[in-house]
């Protein structure tokens, strides 16, 4: 099902930045990183930006040490002709007020026609504020775009329909977040980007960073893992969830995920939730254990390359999207699978 719509924004107030359309010649990608480690999702945003055929530039923001660590990999990204650096301690925690003001100033000074970021927590926090500063529409969570640069595609209704959006010609810059699973990652090899520092923008804001608690895990990051093992409410308890899923995930070198039902029941942390209101993943292998296959969960994993489902209910909706299905008691079949995997190299 295809819908076509044109987004319009109210022009009740004067835009804070007036840009000349004749000078808009480049695309800018916000290169997200965590403590100097470049986000894999940003590589997909680079690929989306390259679709337009414009010069594509990147932006790294953070403390001096963070940028030095991230730049080693960022400057190797194929397709970026320039990387802007904004080095300041005020950017160390990605506060939306500071980053939005910085991005707005760069858009004005560097002739940017399109601004891209991955549709992550940071992108979803910063880009709506930026759209407000520039008085432009926010085009969020796209899965495709046309080379014309004004037509975009995004999923709606939990991925059961696709919306085609034609942005308003009044928007001085197109502000876009990208669903990373919909685009290949830009190669990190043989890059030749020119490095340029940009002016730091100081923002007077009441928002202050207080603290953060990081969960340390030896497993791959769920959002970018090549293999994911997810569990549902059928695991019955947190103890069973850990006892059944963790050995299989360890055998496969996989990340652990969970359905919303499992998270709501307290079996797994909210950070592990896969689905419409959780993380959207598209690994090479997705193993769904004790997950019925509610539409909200399918929206977060149905683009996986290979889906294996284990469920004792032969009518479970998960089997409709699975490439391989096993109708069995998970408490018997999964330990047996782990035992068999111990005899082979995965």
Swiss-Prot record:
Entry's cofactor comment: Binds 1 FAD per dimer.
Cell compartments where the protein resides: Mitochondrion matrix
Gene Ontology terms for molecular function: electron transfer activity; flavin adenine dinucleotide binding
Cofactors (names): FAD
BP-aspect Gene Ontology terms: fatty acid beta-oxidation using acyl-CoA dehydrogenase
Entry annotated with the keyword Heme: no
CDD domains named among the record's database cross-references: ETF_alpha
Keyword Electron transport in record: yes
Domain of life: Eukaryota
SMART domains (alphabetical): ETF (SM00893)
Entry GO terms, CC: mitochondrial matrix
Keywords: Electron transport, FAD, Flavoprotein, Mitochondrion, Transit peptide, Transport
Chain positions recorded as FAD binding sites: 285-313
Major place of residence: mitochondrion
InterPro entries, sorted: DHS-like_NAD/FAD-binding_dom (IPR029035), ETF_a/b_N (IPR014730), ETF_a/FixB (IPR001308), ETF_alpha_N (IPR033947), ETF_asu_C (IPR014731), ETF_asu_C_CS (IPR018206), Rossmann-like_a/b/a_fold (IPR014729)
Similarity annotation: Belongs to the ETF alpha-subunit/FixB family.
Subunit structure: Heterodimer of an alpha and a beta subunit.
UniProt function note: The electron transfer flavoprotein serves as a specific electron acceptor for several dehydrogenases, including five acyl-CoA dehydrogenases, glutaryl-CoA and sarcosine dehydrogenase. It transfers the electrons to the main mitochondrial respiratory chain via ETF-ubiquinone oxidoreductase (ETF dehydrogenase).
Protein name: Probable electron transfer flavoprotein subunit alpha, mitochondrial
Organism: Cryptococcus gattii serotype B (strain WM276 / ATCC MYA-4071) (Filobasidiella gattii)
Lineage of origin: Eukaryota, Fungi, Dikarya, Basidiomycota, Agaricomycotina
